[in-house]
């Protein structure tokens, strides 16, 4: 077993023992996707530390434990259609693709250099998810509606365009807060009557979601 694979298994076992990874589908995705393929070369040795890592351009790849929390509360299954807001490195989109299928994943990124970085990483790793260049605060109406919208940057609030692009009984998962430096992880479930039920999953810190309906630069 290579050192990277050994480190990956150790981290996944730790995430499982601490309760971050709860389901087989999330565990299998973590085992399948190599985080080292989605980070800059100078960070490769830190691929399986449970910490956020800079990918450049003011952006980060989240800590594996935070990613696991978000994926678990998203309740993903094969065949669900997912929009990811904030492609970043592409790692999270690859994990979602393992759980839902490549053809069911759309991911959107607004920073040109990050868009190219994430797209290159995903294609090199063999994933054919749809990568869109654009403002994630507007969602991506063209391929809507979605069963899940997963937001990987901090939003000042839940944006109406996301609500309008979710299926009945679908879910929006997002870190939300009125301050740039602290958020709560929220899950909004759309009820049959069209209203949303909000469930809080604790505090977190993400880079700001910049866009027309998000934070300003």
PLM feature segments, named:
Residues 60, 152, 172-174, 178, ...:
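Extracellular beta-propeller repeat domains
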Residues 75-196:
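Conserved nucleotide-cofactor-binding alpha/beta core module
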Residues 1-83, 87, 91-99, 114-125, ...:
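Class I SAM-dependent transferase core
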């Amino acid at each position: 077993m290579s050192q990277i694979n050994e480190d990956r298994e150790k981290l996944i076992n730790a995430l499982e023992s601490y309760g971050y990874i709860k389901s087989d589908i999330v565990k299998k995705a973590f085992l399948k996707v190599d985080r080292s393929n989605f980070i800059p070369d100078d960070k490769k040795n830190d691929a399986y530390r449970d910490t956020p890592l800079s990918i450049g351009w003011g952006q980060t790849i989240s800590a594996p434990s935070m990613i696991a929390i978000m994926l678990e509360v998203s309740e993903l299954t094969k065949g669900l259609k997912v929009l990811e807001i904030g492609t970043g490195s592409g790692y999270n989109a690859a994990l979602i693709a393992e759980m839902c299928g490549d053809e069911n994943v759309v991911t959107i990124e607004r920073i040109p250099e990050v868009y190219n970085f994430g797209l290159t990483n995903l294609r090199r790793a063999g994933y054919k998810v749809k990568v869109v260049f654009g403002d994630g605060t507007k969602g991506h109406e063209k391929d809507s509606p979605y069963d899940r919208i997963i937001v990987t940057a901090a939003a000042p609030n839940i944006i109406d365009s996301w609500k309008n692009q979710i299926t009945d009984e679908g879910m929006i998962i997002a870190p939300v807060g009125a301050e740039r430096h602290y958020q709560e992880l929220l899950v909004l479930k759309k009820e049959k009557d069209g209203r949303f039920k909000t469930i809080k999953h604790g505090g977190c810190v993400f880079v700001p979601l910049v866009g027309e309906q998000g934070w300003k630069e």
